[in-house]
C-alpha cells in the first residue's frame, strides 16, 4: 500500500507499507484456526492491524490433519525490508475439546525459529517465547473471531514458528539481548513504515510545519509510539498534537527552531534518551550504543558500589540496569545526574534558539526524571 497525505500546501508521500512479523503470525494463526474449525481451505486471509490498516495475506504451506492445521504467511517488509523480509511465519493450531463450554481458551507459544527469553527486562518474562504483547493480542483477537463465527468453545493451542528463524537471529540483536534460538515476533502498529532517513526527516518537518501552522508554539516530540503513549496515558495529552521524531533528535530540534517554535518538550524511554546524556543526537543503534557506559559513569559520580557498576556494564537493557541501581537505593541520584547531562546537551544543540525540556520514563518505574522546567512546559501544553 502506498500512502499519500496532503499537509497544508505540501504533499507528504510515503512508500509502500510492509507488515510486521506480528501481523504475519496473527494472519497465519487466523487462517489455520479457520481451516481447522470449518474444514475449508483458505488461500488468503484478512486481519485488522492495530494501526487500523487491513492486511490481506496469501496463505501457503497448508497442512491439514484431523485436529491440527498448519500454514504460513510470507513476511513482506514493504519498501523498508529487514532481515525477516521474505521469511515464512508459520502457525500450527491444534484443537482440544477441553474447556468450560462457554468460552474458548487460547494458548500461544513459540516453536522452531522463535526466540526464547532468558534475561529479565524485555517485553516478555524469562522463559516465554519472544512473541511480544501486541502480537499476542492480535493473535488472540483474530482467532477469537474465528471461534465466535464457528461457535467453538474448546481449547486451541497456537504454535508460531519461523523455519529459518534461528539463522536470521544471528543477524539481529537477539543474542545480545538474551533471546536465544530464533527471532522475535514484534510490532506495535502491525505495519512497517518505510524508514529511509531522508523520507523520515521530511515527514518530521512536514508534521512540525503543520503543528506550527495550526498555532502551536510548543512542539511535543517523542522518538516513537511508546513515548507518545506515555504522554497520553500519564498526562492525557492529545496524540494528534504530537510529533514522532524517530532517532533524529538533534535534527528535530533544528527543524523546530527553524520553523519558529518557542519551545520543545521531548519525552522518551530511558533506553533511547540515555544516549542524549552522552551528546548523541542520532540515537539509532547503528550510530553508536553507550547506554550502559553512561549509566555506569553516572554511577561512579554517585558513589555506586563497584559490584553494581560491573552488573550495569553487563546488562543489555536499561530496564535491567535500573533494577540493579534501584536495589542500591541510587535510582533517584543517578537519574538526577543523567537529567543534568541530557539538559546540557539538549540546550547545547538548541543554542538559545528555543527552550527545550525533557521527560524520561521507564516501563517498570514510570516517570524517572524531568529537566528543570519540563513540568512548567507540560502545563502550558496541556
Residue ranges and their predicted role:
Residues 1-8, 13:
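Single conserved hydrophobic/aromatic residue that forms the stacking wall/gate
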Residues 16-53, 60-75, 79-85, 91-262, ...:
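N-terminal loops that bind phosphate or other acidic moieties
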